[in-house]
Amino acid sequence: MISVNPSTSNLEKLDLHNLPAEQTALDIKNLDLYYGEDQALYDISMRIPNNRVTAFIGPSGCGKSTLLRCINRMNDLVEICRIEGQIDMHGHNIYGKNVDVASLRRRVGMVFQRPNPFPKSIYENVVYGLRLQGVKDKRVLDEAVETSLRGAALWDEVKDRLNASAFSLSGGQQQRLVIARSIAIEPEILLLDEPTSALDPISTLTIEELITDLKDKYTVVIVTHNMQQAARVSDQTAFLYMGKLIEYADTDTLFTTPSEKQTEDYITGRYG
């Protein structure tokens, strides 16, 4: 049996299928995705609540990361990719005709599997996005660096060496730096694509504790191949299989009393 973090199971239960608009960060409606003639996602519909951690789980190739990348339109970069359906972010379709994709990606931060700091100092990594936005005031930048590094639980470890190369940090520290860089531009939503898969157990635990803290300010969506991790950090979990959303429920419900046999088979290790 997979144990669920008590802090998540004690949260108010939400009716995920009838979530009020004011509690909904993302409303995914009848989403289909194709790579050329091959369909990768099939009629995905789900509502992701504000200021909660939502996990996408499922076997390799099930569509977890593909769905995640729809949320900030990273799939636009794939020439043969075509999307039908829509995703509303706080009531506005992010696939609408007049959407500024660059602006959308400022509102939706993303952290990938492997830490990808820029070849710059720790300080310059954090302020990179702010500089792109035209922020030049050193006081504003300094405050953003401290606030973001504190938010990523890294400030105390690097405050005396902000001008050191980001590459001088450990893997776990680099991943927290990337998170700090993402939150420096104050996104509304933070996407994490298997953020601990390349890290050691101690660094993984630090990131997991950070994820739990981040939901105080952000809506967090995490893709993970690790079911135990999903149970530890998430409030809701969506199980995908072969591009289809099989089940979406509060994490403790999905892991203890799943309603679909496919879900039960997966979490008990019968396949996947």
Curated annotation (Swiss-Prot):
Coiled coil location: none
Keywords, in A-Z order: ATP-binding, Cell inner membrane, Cell membrane, Membrane, Nucleotide-binding, Phosphate transport, Translocase, Transport
Binding site for ATP: G58, P59, S60, G61, C62, G63, K64, S65
Domain ABC transporter residues, every copy: 26-267
Pfam families assigned to the protein according to its UniProt record, in alphabetical order: ABC_tran
Subcellular location: Cell inner membrane
Catalysis performed (reactions): phosphate(out) + ATP + H2O = ADP + 2 phosphate(in) + H(+)
Protein's job: Part of the ABC transporter complex PstSACB involved in phosphate import. Responsible for energy coupling to the transport system.
Assembly information from the UniProt record: The complex is composed of two ATP-binding proteins (PstB), two transmembrane proteins (PstC and PstA) and a solute-binding protein (PstS).
UniProt-recorded name of the protein: Phosphate import ATP-binding protein PstB
Organism of origin: Idiomarina loihiensis (strain ATCC BAA-735 / DSM 15497 / L2-TR)
